[in-house]
UniProtKB/Swiss-Prot annotation:
May control digestion processes. Residues 1-20 form the signal peptide. The keyword Secreted applies. It comes from Aquarana catesbeiana. This is Gastrin/cholecystokinin-like peptide. The lineage of its organism: Eukaryota, Metazoa, Chordata, Craniata, Vertebrata. The modification Sulfotyrosine is found at residue 86. The gene is GAST. Expressed in antrum, duodenum, colon, pancreas, brain and testis. No expression found in kidney, lung, liver, skin or distal two-thirds of small intestine. In the brain, strongly expressed in the pituitary gland with moderate expression in the neural lobe, brain stem and hypothalamus. PANTHER family: CHOLECYSTOKININ (PTHR10786:SF0). InterPro entries: CCK-like (IPR015499), Gastrin/CCK (IPR001651), Gastrin/cholecystokinin_CS (IPR013152).
């Protein structure tokens, strides 16, 4: 009887240890990710704070129009399926309606 109690206590302790270990690893990974995000946020803030007013204006006047022009040219690439796939679907629907009418 004493052996069964000792074995059950030992198994319970091992199970608890096995369940607690992944939780601590998950928490440490979560804290590591938060630290990385806060470091990158701080460096961005420091970079923006270190720029002079003229440098900020230069970035706004040159970089933003360039980005907007790239985005406006890239609109065709955002919807590559528009002509290719939907035209076939419309033909399929038209053929289906013609078959049921005749």
């Amino acid at each position: 009887m004493d052996k069964k109690v000792c074995v059950s206590i030992l198994l319970a302790m091992l199970a608890i240890a096995a369940l607690c270990r992944p939780m601590t690893e998950l928490e440490s990974a979560r804290h590591g990710a938060q630290r990385k995000n806060s470091i990158s946020d701080v460096s961005r803030r420091d970079l923006l704070a270190s720029l002079t007013h003229e440098q900020k204006q230069l970035i706004m006047s040159q970089l933003l129009p360039e980005l907007l022009s790239e985005l406006s040219n890239a609109e065709d690439h955002l919807h590559p399926m528009r002509d290719r796939d939907y035209a076939g679907w419309m033909d399929f629907g038209r053929r289906s309606s013609e078959v049921t009418e005749s």
